[in-house]
């Protein structure tokens, strides 16, 4: 998901491009203003932390772009492509390493496990919003 700072900075296309160039298939995307209720559910595991109210306020301050990509090891490799949550620990070449300086404005969110990804997909998208299709390029990416 591209967070409000990433949307404001015009980085949505860059994020999509990096995943597609890696061979991942975009199957769902939308731009929306997330409700506080949705964000509280999404970040439920962080509810007891002191920065939680600030996180919810930030994430509801502007539009976000949730998206779903498919492909081999997309969650694991996607986390590497995004970079560390704290931008100062992110390697150059990662999205956060290239575009972030502050943990409070770190451009993107990515699921940390397949289980989290499934939970988050169900929070942000209805089954009808997930588009299943075959790409002509698939045989050129996967054996």
UniProtKB/Swiss-Prot annotation:
<feature type="binding site">
    <location>
        <position position="106"/>
    </location>
    <ligand>
        <name>ADP</name>
    </ligand>
</feature>
<feature type="binding site">
    <location>
        <position position="3"/>
    </location>
    <ligand>
        <name>ATP</name>
    </ligand>
</feature>
<dbReference type="Pfam" id="PF00334">
    <property type="entry name" value="NDK"/>
</dbReference>
<feature type="domain" description="NDPK-like">
    <location>
        <begin position="1"/>
        <end position="132"/>
    </location>
</feature>
<keyword id="KW-0808">Transferase</keyword>
<feature type="binding site">
    <location>
        <position position="85"/>
    </location>
    <ligand>
        <name>ATP</name>
    </ligand>
</feature>
<dbReference type="InterPro" id="IPR034907">
    <property type="entry name" value="NDK-like_dom"/>
</dbReference>
<keyword id="KW-0545">Nucleotide biosynthesis</keyword>
<keyword id="KW-0067">ATP-binding</keyword>
<dbReference type="GO" id="GO:0006166">
    <property type="term" value="P:purine ribonucleoside salvage"/>
</dbReference>
<feature type="binding site">
    <location>
        <position position="3"/>
    </location>
    <ligand>
        <name>ADP</name>
    </ligand>
</feature>
<dbReference type="InterPro" id="IPR001564">
    <property type="entry name" value="Nucleoside_diP_kinase"/>
</dbReference>
<feature type="active site" description="Pros-phosphohistidine intermediate">
    <location>
        <position position="109"/>
    </location>
</feature>
<dbReference type="GO" id="GO:0032261">
    <property type="term" value="P:purine nucleotide salvage"/>
</dbReference>
<feature type="binding site">
    <location>
        <position position="106"/>
    </location>
    <ligand>
        <name>ATP</name>
    </ligand>
</feature>
<feature type="binding site">
    <location>
        <position position="96"/>
    </location>
    <ligand>
        <name>ADP</name>
    </ligand>
</feature>
<dbReference type="GO" id="GO:0006183">
    <property type="term" value="P:GTP biosynthetic process"/>
</dbReference>
<comment type="pathway">
    <text>Purine metabolism; purine nucleotide biosynthesis.</text>
</comment>
<feature type="binding site">
    <location>
        <position position="79"/>
    </location>
    <ligand>
        <name>ADP</name>
    </ligand>
</feature>
<feature type="binding site">
    <location>
        <position position="96"/>
    </location>
    <ligand>
        <name>ATP</name>
    </ligand>
</feature>
<dbReference type="GO" id="GO:0009202">
    <property type="term" value="P:deoxyribonucleoside triphosphate biosynthetic process"/>
</dbReference>
<dbReference type="GO" id="GO:0006228">
    <property type="term" value="P:UTP biosynthetic process"/>
</dbReference>
<dbReference type="GO" id="GO:0042802">
    <property type="term" value="F:identical protein binding"/>
</dbReference>
<dbReference type="GO" id="GO:0006241">
    <property type="term" value="P:CTP biosynthetic process"/>
</dbReference>
<feature type="binding site">
    <location>
        <position position="51"/>
    </location>
    <ligand>
        <name>ADP</name>
    </ligand>
</feature>
<feature type="binding site">
    <location>
        <position position="103"/>
    </location>
    <ligand>
        <name>ADP</name>
    </ligand>
</feature>
<dbReference type="GO" id="GO:0005524">
    <property type="term" value="F:ATP binding"/>
</dbReference>
<dbReference type="InterPro" id="IPR036850">
    <property type="entry name" value="NDK-like_dom_sf"/>
</dbReference>
<dbReference type="GO" id="GO:0043531">
    <property type="term" value="F:ADP binding"/>
</dbReference>
<keyword id="KW-0418">Kinase</keyword>
<keyword id="KW-0460">Magnesium</keyword>
<keyword id="KW-0547">Nucleotide-binding</keyword>
<protein>
    <recommendedName>
        <fullName>Nucleoside diphosphate kinase</fullName>
        <ecNumber>2.7.4.6</ecNumber>
    </recommendedName>
</protein>
<dbReference type="GO" id="GO:0004550">
    <property type="term" value="F:nucleoside diphosphate kinase activity"/>
</dbReference>
<feature type="binding site">
    <location>
        <position position="51"/>
    </location>
    <ligand>
        <name>ATP</name>
    </ligand>
</feature>
<comment type="subunit">
    <text>Homohexamer.</text>
</comment>
<comment type="function">
    <text>Major role in the synthesis of nucleoside triphosphates other than ATP. The ATP gamma phosphate is transferred to the NDP beta phosphate via a ping-pong mechanism, using a phosphorylated active-site intermediate.</text>
</comment>
<dbReference type="GO" id="GO:0034214">
    <property type="term" value="P:protein hexamerization"/>
</dbReference>
<keyword id="KW-0660">Purine salvage</keyword>
<feature type="binding site">
    <location>
        <position position="85"/>
    </location>
    <ligand>
        <name>ADP</name>
    </ligand>
</feature>
<comment type="similarity">
    <text>Belongs to the NDK family.</text>
</comment>
<feature type="binding site">
    <location>
        <position position="79"/>
    </location>
    <ligand>
        <name>ATP</name>
    </ligand>
</feature>
């Amino acid at each position: 998901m591209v967070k409000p700072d990433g949307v404001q900075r015009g980085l949505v296309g860059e994020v999509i491009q990096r995943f597609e160039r890696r061979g991942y298939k975009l199957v769902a995307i939308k731009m929306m203003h997330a409700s506080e209720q949705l964000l509280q559910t999404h970040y439920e595991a962080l509810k007891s932390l002191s920065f939680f109210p600030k996180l919810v306020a930030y994430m509801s301050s502007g539009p976000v772009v949730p998206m779903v990509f498919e492909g081999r090891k997309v969650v694991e490799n996607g986390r590497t492509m995004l970079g560390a949550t704290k931008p100062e620990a992110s390697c150059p070449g990662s999205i956060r390493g290239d575009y972030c300086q502050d943990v409070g404005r770190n451009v993107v969110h990515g699921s940390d496990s397949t289980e989290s990804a499934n939970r988050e997909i169900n929070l942000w998208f209805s089954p009808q919003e997930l588009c299943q299709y075959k790409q002509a390029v698939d045989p050129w990416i996967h054996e």
